Curated annotation (Swiss-Prot):
Key component of the proton channel; it plays a direct role in the translocation of protons across the membrane. F-type ATPases have 2 components, CF(1) - the catalytic core - and CF(0) - the membrane proton channel. CF(1) has five subunits: alpha(3), beta(3), gamma(1), delta(1), epsilon(1). CF(0) has three main subunits: a(1), b(2) and c(9-12). The alpha and beta chains form an alternating ring which encloses part of the gamma chain. CF(1) is attached to CF(0) by a central stalk formed by the gamma and epsilon chains, while a peripheral stalk is formed by the delta and b chains. The chain crosses the membrane at residues 31-51, 89-109, 133-153, 205-225, 235-255. GO terms for cellular component: plasma membrane; proton-transporting ATP synthase complex. HAMAP family: ATP_synth_a_bact. Keywords: ATP synthesis, Cell inner membrane, Cell membrane, CF(0), Hydrogen ion transport, Ion transport, Membrane, Transmembrane, Transmembrane helix, Transport. InterPro entries: ATP_syn_F0_a_bact/chloroplast, ATP_synth_F0_asu, ATP_synth_F0_asu_AS, F0_ATP_A_sf. It comes from Dichelobacter nodosus (strain VCS1703A). This is ATP synthase subunit a. GO terms for molecular function: proton-transporting ATP synthase activity, rotational mechanism. SUPFAM superfamilies: F1F0 ATP synthase subunit A. Its main location: membrane. Pfam families: ATP-synt_A.
Length: 263
């Protein structure tokens, strides 16, 4: 601990990594993650609703152009996997891409700005980037896998069809006895596959944004006059990371949904 009440570099980093939490253990709630996730989700819905309400058939404005570009890009991506437009898959992909993009953009706000303002009103900890909280990224990836299971249930007309679909791949047999014998191995591999999807989706998003936030914090330790060049360069590079991670999460979700359709 530094003398005079000053925090060491390690203590500053630790302070920025702590969420505003209520409760303990499994029942702990990260209030800052919940608040900013809901706020950004509502902002995304309001923004697209406003653009749609003001949409014109003539010459579109800048906001309408951007919204149409995003919509057409996602619709064409879905068509590439499914061969046709799918409003259900397209809506899911659009929601995930925009929501995660809004999450990630928060990482471009100066790292000390909002936490310092929150400290003035008695809030000791505040993390404003939901993507840097593994609880948020795991919740999102678990939701995606649960949606794929719901589609598996629907496409196979019930529980028995769902179990048959999950228990007949990747090892196949034409005979009934062979299918029964291979069912436990196939089903176990499907469970492992779904768990791997959850871990890979969540840790990829969390790891990239968490590392980016750490770099921003480390840059603030430099003398004030020397922060501009590395900070600006990293911010420009991070814009690519912010967009790319939202795209990767979206495209993998579409891939998983297309795999369900094919089976």
């Amino acid at each position: 601990m530094a003398t005079g009440g000053e925090m060491t570099s390690a203590e500053i980093i630790h302070h920025h990594m702590v969420n505003l939490t209520v409760g303990e253990g499994f029942w702990a709630l990260h209030l800052d993650t919940l608040f900013f996730s809901i706020l950004l989700g509502c902002s995304f819905c309001w923004l697209f609703y406003s653009i749609g309400k003001k949409a014109e058939s003539g010459v579109p404005g800048f906001a309408q152009n951007v919204a149409e570009m995003v919509f057409d890009f996602i619709d064409n991506t879905v068509k590439g996997f499914f061969g046709e437009s799918r409003s259900d898959i397209g809506s899911l992909a659009l929601t995930l891409f925009c929501w995660i993009f809004f999450w990630n953009v928060m990482d471009l706000i100066p790292v000390d700005l909002l936490p310092s303002m929150a400290k003035l009103i008695g809030i000791p900890y505040l993390k404003i980037v939901p993507s840097t909280d593994p609880n948020a990224t795991f919740a999102l990836s678990i939701s995606v896998v649960l949606i794929t299971l719901v589609y598996t249930f629907r496409n196979n007309h019930g529980l028995l069809g769902m179990l048959r679909a999950m228990g007949t791949h990747p090892f196949e047999s034409s005979g009934l006895i062979g299918k029964i014998l291979l069912f436990p191995a196939n089903f176990a591999l499907r469970i492992v596959e779904d768990m791997a999807k959850i871990v890979s989706l969540s840790l990829r998003l969390f790891g990239n944004l968490f590392a980016g936030e750490i770099v921003f914090i480390l840059i603030t330790f430099l003398p004030f006059w020397s922060q501009w060049v590395p900070g600006g360069a990293w911010a420009i590079f991070h814009i690519l990371v912010v967009t790319l991670q939202a795209y990767v999460f979206m495209i993998l979700t579409i891939v998983y949904m297309s795999m369900v359709e094919k089976h």
